[in-house]
Design a protein with these regions (language model features):
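Acidic/polar low-complexity surface segments
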Residues: 66-84, 120-140, 188
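LRR N-terminal entry segment and analogous cap-like coil->beta motifs
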Residues: 3-74, 80
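Tandem repeat domain/solenoid detector
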Residues: 38, 59-62, 87-95, 111-117, ...
Protein backbone atom coordinates (compact mmCIF):
# COMPACT_ATOMS: atom_id res chain seq x y z
CA UNK A 1 0.00 0.00 0.00
CA UNK A 2 1.44 3.36 -1.04
CA UNK A 3 -0.66 6.15 0.52
CA UNK A 4 -3.70 5.68 -1.70
CA UNK A 5 -2.76 2.91 -4.13
CA UNK A 6 -3.13 -0.83 -4.03
CA UNK A 7 -0.20 -2.07 -6.11
CA UNK A 8 -0.66 -5.39 -7.89
CA UNK A 9 1.77 -6.77 -10.46
CA UNK A 10 0.58 -7.61 -13.95
CA UNK A 11 1.60 -11.29 -13.86
CA UNK A 12 -0.55 -12.54 -10.96
CA UNK A 13 -3.43 -14.93 -11.71
CA UNK A 14 -5.32 -14.71 -8.40
CA UNK A 15 -6.07 -11.68 -6.26
CA UNK A 16 -7.21 -12.91 -2.84
CA UNK A 17 -7.84 -10.27 -0.18
CA UNK A 18 -8.26 -11.39 3.44
CA UNK A 19 -11.02 -10.13 5.73
CA UNK A 20 -10.90 -6.58 7.12
CA UNK A 21 -8.52 -5.15 4.50
CA UNK A 22 -9.25 -1.44 4.54
CA UNK A 23 -6.57 0.77 2.98
CA UNK A 24 -7.17 4.51 2.98
CA UNK A 25 -8.39 4.77 -0.62
CA UNK A 26 -11.58 6.14 -2.15
CA UNK A 27 -11.46 4.21 -5.43
CA UNK A 28 -10.31 0.78 -6.56
CA UNK A 29 -9.78 0.42 -10.30
CA UNK A 30 -8.59 -2.88 -11.75
CA UNK A 31 -7.94 -2.56 -15.47
CA UNK A 32 -6.25 -4.21 -18.42
CA UNK A 33 -2.79 -3.75 -16.92
CA UNK A 34 -3.57 -6.92 -14.90
CA UNK A 35 -3.43 -9.07 -18.03
CA UNK A 36 -3.10 -12.47 -16.30
CA UNK A 37 -5.69 -12.09 -13.53
CA UNK A 38 -8.19 -14.99 -13.53
CA UNK A 39 -9.73 -14.80 -10.06
CA UNK A 40 -10.68 -12.03 -7.64
CA UNK A 41 -11.79 -13.06 -4.16
CA UNK A 42 -12.36 -10.26 -1.64
CA UNK A 43 -13.04 -11.22 1.97
CA UNK A 44 -15.47 -9.91 4.58
CA UNK A 45 -15.58 -6.25 5.63
CA UNK A 46 -13.04 -4.97 3.11
CA UNK A 47 -12.65 -1.65 1.31
CA UNK A 48 -14.87 0.39 3.62
CA UNK A 49 -15.30 3.93 2.31
CA UNK A 50 -14.24 3.04 -1.25
CA UNK A 51 -16.92 4.74 -3.33
CA UNK A 52 -15.78 3.73 -6.80
CA UNK A 53 -15.03 0.11 -7.75
CA UNK A 54 -14.20 -0.54 -11.40
CA UNK A 55 -13.13 -3.69 -13.21
CA UNK A 56 -12.48 -2.96 -16.89
CA UNK A 57 -10.81 -5.02 -19.60
CA UNK A 58 -9.56 -7.96 -17.52
CA UNK A 59 -9.87 -10.44 -20.38
CA UNK A 60 -8.52 -13.47 -18.46
CA UNK A 61 -10.75 -12.91 -15.40
CA UNK A 62 -13.14 -15.84 -14.85
CA UNK A 63 -14.53 -15.36 -11.35
CA UNK A 64 -15.37 -12.46 -9.02
CA UNK A 65 -16.38 -13.23 -5.43
CA UNK A 66 -16.92 -10.52 -2.83
CA UNK A 67 -17.81 -11.71 0.66
CA UNK A 68 -20.06 -10.09 3.29
CA UNK A 69 -20.04 -6.43 4.28
CA UNK A 70 -17.44 -5.18 1.81
CA UNK A 71 -17.57 -1.85 -0.05
CA UNK A 72 -19.95 -0.25 2.41
CA UNK A 73 -20.55 3.46 2.70
CA UNK A 74 -22.80 5.71 4.70
CA UNK A 75 -25.20 8.40 3.56
CA UNK A 76 -22.56 11.13 3.71
CA UNK A 77 -20.02 9.57 1.34
CA UNK A 78 -22.34 7.76 -1.07
CA UNK A 79 -22.92 10.57 -3.59
CA UNK A 80 -21.67 9.43 -7.02
CA UNK A 81 -20.66 5.97 -5.79
CA UNK A 82 -20.55 3.20 -8.37
CA UNK A 83 -19.58 -0.38 -9.08
CA UNK A 84 -18.78 -0.91 -12.77
CA UNK A 85 -17.70 -4.23 -14.24
CA UNK A 86 -17.20 -4.29 -18.00
CA UNK A 87 -15.27 -5.59 -20.99
CA UNK A 88 -14.06 -8.83 -19.37
CA UNK A 89 -14.23 -11.49 -22.10
CA UNK A 90 -13.83 -14.60 -19.90
CA UNK A 91 -15.74 -13.59 -16.75
CA UNK A 92 -18.23 -16.39 -16.04
CA UNK A 93 -19.56 -15.79 -12.54
CA UNK A 94 -20.15 -12.94 -10.12
CA UNK A 95 -21.13 -13.54 -6.49
CA UNK A 96 -21.61 -10.61 -4.11
CA UNK A 97 -22.11 -11.31 -0.41
CA UNK A 98 -24.63 -10.20 2.17
CA UNK A 99 -24.65 -6.49 3.03
CA UNK A 100 -21.96 -5.53 0.48
CA UNK A 101 -22.11 -2.28 -1.51
CA UNK A 102 -24.45 -0.74 1.03
CA UNK A 103 -25.35 2.84 0.07
CA UNK A 104 -23.80 2.54 -3.41
CA UNK A 105 -25.75 4.48 -6.05
CA UNK A 106 -25.13 2.30 -9.09
CA UNK A 107 -24.26 -1.21 -10.21
CA UNK A 108 -23.45 -1.71 -13.88
CA UNK A 109 -22.43 -4.85 -15.74
CA UNK A 110 -21.63 -4.29 -19.42
CA UNK A 111 -20.08 -6.23 -22.28
CA UNK A 112 -19.38 -9.49 -20.45
CA UNK A 113 -19.82 -12.06 -23.25
CA UNK A 114 -19.01 -15.20 -21.16
CA UNK A 115 -20.94 -14.30 -18.00
CA UNK A 116 -23.44 -17.05 -17.17
CA UNK A 117 -24.40 -16.37 -13.54
CA UNK A 118 -24.94 -13.40 -11.20
CA UNK A 119 -25.74 -14.07 -7.54
CA UNK A 120 -26.26 -11.22 -5.10
CA UNK A 121 -26.94 -12.20 -1.50
CA UNK A 122 -29.55 -10.46 0.62
CA UNK A 123 -29.26 -6.76 1.32
CA UNK A 124 -26.57 -6.14 -1.29
CA UNK A 125 -26.89 -2.60 -2.60
CA UNK A 126 -29.23 -1.65 0.19
CA UNK A 127 -29.83 2.08 0.13
CA UNK A 128 -32.47 3.30 2.50
CA UNK A 129 -33.38 6.62 1.03
CA UNK A 130 -36.45 8.48 -0.02
CA UNK A 131 -38.00 9.75 -3.22
CA UNK A 132 -35.80 12.82 -3.24
CA UNK A 133 -32.39 11.23 -2.64
CA UNK A 134 -32.67 8.18 -4.90
CA UNK A 135 -32.19 10.17 -8.11
CA UNK A 136 -29.74 8.42 -10.44
CA UNK A 137 -29.57 5.16 -8.48
CA UNK A 138 -29.64 2.18 -10.82
CA UNK A 139 -28.88 -1.43 -11.56
CA UNK A 140 -27.97 -1.96 -15.23
CA UNK A 141 -27.04 -5.30 -16.78
CA UNK A 142 -26.45 -5.24 -20.53
CA UNK A 143 -24.68 -6.97 -23.41
CA UNK A 144 -24.04 -10.26 -21.62
CA UNK A 145 -24.68 -12.80 -24.39
CA UNK A 146 -24.34 -15.99 -22.29
CA UNK A 147 -26.04 -14.80 -19.10
CA UNK A 148 -28.56 -17.45 -18.05
CA UNK A 149 -29.30 -16.83 -14.37
CA UNK A 150 -29.73 -13.74 -12.21
CA UNK A 151 -30.46 -14.13 -8.49
CA UNK A 152 -30.95 -10.97 -6.46
CA UNK A 153 -31.34 -11.46 -2.73
CA UNK A 154 -33.85 -10.15 -0.25
CA UNK A 155 -33.98 -6.39 0.22
CA UNK A 156 -31.37 -5.63 -2.43
CA UNK A 157 -31.68 -2.37 -4.39
CA UNK A 158 -34.38 -1.08 -2.06
CA UNK A 159 -35.55 2.38 -3.20
CA UNK A 160 -33.42 2.34 -6.37
CA UNK A 161 -34.66 4.44 -9.24
CA UNK A 162 -34.21 1.89 -12.03
CA UNK A 163 -33.55 -1.77 -12.85
CA UNK A 164 -32.58 -2.30 -16.49
CA UNK A 165 -31.81 -5.54 -18.32
CA UNK A 166 -30.78 -5.04 -21.95
CA UNK A 167 -29.54 -7.37 -24.68
CA UNK A 168 -29.43 -10.60 -22.67
CA UNK A 169 -30.38 -13.16 -25.37
CA UNK A 170 -29.64 -16.31 -23.29
CA UNK A 171 -31.39 -15.28 -20.07
CA UNK A 172 -33.53 -18.11 -18.69
CA UNK A 173 -34.10 -17.23 -15.04
CA UNK A 174 -34.46 -14.09 -12.92
CA UNK A 175 -35.03 -14.70 -9.21
CA UNK A 176 -35.86 -11.65 -7.15
CA UNK A 177 -36.21 -12.50 -3.47
CA UNK A 178 -38.62 -10.75 -1.14
CA UNK A 179 -38.36 -6.94 -1.16
CA UNK A 180 -35.71 -6.86 -3.92
CA UNK A 181 -36.21 -3.63 -5.87
CA UNK A 182 -38.97 -2.63 -3.48
CA UNK A 183 -40.15 0.88 -4.35
CA UNK A 184 -38.17 0.79 -7.61
CA UNK A 185 -39.43 3.52 -9.92
CA UNK A 186 -38.66 1.97 -13.33
CA UNK A 187 -38.00 -1.54 -14.66
CA UNK A 188 -36.81 -2.05 -18.25
CA UNK A 189 -36.45 -5.36 -20.11
CA UNK A 190 -35.10 -4.74 -23.62
CA UNK A 191 -33.84 -7.14 -26.33
CA UNK A 192 -34.25 -10.22 -24.18
CA UNK A 193 -34.43 -13.92 -25.05
CA UNK A 194 -36.68 -14.58 -28.03
Amino acid sequence: IDDCELIVTSCIESLIIDDHFNPDISSLILNNSLISLKQIDIGNDCFKNVNQFVIDGLNELESLIIEEGSFTLDDENSRGSSCLIMNCDQLKQIHIGYWSFRWYESFELKNLPSLTSIHLDQYAWLKIVNEKTRKGSKCLIMNCDQLKDIHIGRGSFYWYESFELKNLPSLISIQLDRHAFMKCHRIVFESMNN
